[in-house]
Amino acid sequence: LLPIVGNLLNSLL
């Protein structure tokens, strides 16, 4: 879950 959330945040940023 952590890696997935990190990837989503990085995609938005």
From Swiss-Prot:
Superkingdom: Eukaryota
Tissue specificity field: Expressed by the skin glands.
GO biological process: defense response to bacterium; innate immune response; killing of cells of another organism
Main location (coarse class): secreted
Leucine amide carried by residues: 13
Subcellular localization: Secreted
GO cellular component terms, A-Z: extracellular region
Disulfide linkage: none
Keywords: Amidation, Amphibian defense peptide, Antibiotic, Antimicrobial, Cytolysis, Hemolysis, Immunity, Innate immunity, Secreted
Stated role: Has no antibacterial activity. Has hemolytic activity.
Family according to the record: Belongs to the frog skin active peptide (FSAP) family. Temporin subfamily.
Protein name (record): Temporin-1Td
Organism (species): Rana temporaria
